[in-house]
């Protein structure tokens, strides 16, 4: 089996012409759909004091003040790949953190998460869905009004930001605890 990689094309539908090197008269056009490198799915969301809308370029516009630290917005969607992924936020809003968590078939969080600016992470076995979160990292959240570009992609190398294929997934409020919160004493 041969793999065909298409580069330099914008996401959408196109045709690929495949021709024989032995007999150039033998060729065929194959319709293909070029998908975004950005694996995230998101869209409008509101909850915990924050509101997100989708800009015309596919980035998110986030406004409001989170209700508390580690509160914010989240979107859950089917996991589109296996292997290693990396998360980057080339355009960010100070005081908001982005992460992607791995969920099993029952919606329970599996070990690990991928955070923006961190290393590439192997998707754990049993992952069925991903949960993309934008949470306040401030102890006392302040008002936000800005644009954010986030990209989750396969592999361990981050590339230039692309609009994700799905920017119409409704999101909602999320409240999470950082890993260290699980180890606090009462």
Kindly give the residue locations of the regions a language model identified.
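Extracytoplasmic soluble-region selector
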Residues: 1-37
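Non-cytosolic beta-sheet module surface loops
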Residues: 8-10, 22, 79, 89-94, ...
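Surface-exposed coil/turn segments at beta-strand junctions on protein surfaces, enriched
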Residues: 9-11, 23, 55, 80-82, ...
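Exposed beta-strand face motif in extracellular beta-rich ectodomains
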Residues: 12-16, 85, 128-130
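Extracellular polysaccharide-targeting segments
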Residues: 31-69, 81, 124, 133-186
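Extra-cytoplasmic beta-strand recognition segments
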Residues: 45, 66, 71-100, 118-125, ...
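Extracellular carbohydrate recognition and processing domains
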Residues: 105-128
